Amino acid sequence: MTAGFLSGLLALLLGATGPAPSHCPPGHPACRETYGRIVYVERVDPDGDGDAHFVIVDPQGITLPGLTAIDVRAGLRPHPLPGPGELISAAGPVQTGSYGQSQIHALELHVTR
């Protein structure tokens, strides 16, 4: 079991209705799965490529202790964008962001609506 699955299961057991879990593609060794509550959304894309960024509370702490940043390409960007307090799940490789931070580059993303 992955940490993303376990945190999603914990949220469900505590009464939160969350999104479907996101899964890594088979054979993708650098892929990570995550699930958590949004604390920050970058709604306006400063470089104009149409992606979105989320920061979620995540015990894995891929970006910082207790926090994981998720980069979502334009084609996967949910509409409307979820906001702080909403639950999302994501899976994808961990890559270095423009500020040197570790973040998940989402290949799969699910949002609670």
What are these regions (language model features)?
Residues 29-50:
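Structural detector for short beta-strands of small beta-barrel domains
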Residues 42-45, 60, 92, 96:
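Sec/Tat-exported extracytoplasmic proteins
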Residues 35-37, 89-93:
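Residues within well-ordered beta-strands of beta-sheet-rich folds
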Residues 73-91:
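Short nucleic-acid-contacting surface segments enriched for D/E, G, S/T with interspersed K/R
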Residues 4-13:
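Bacterial N-terminal signal peptides
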Residues 46-70:
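OB-fold (S1/OB) nucleic-acid-binding surfaces
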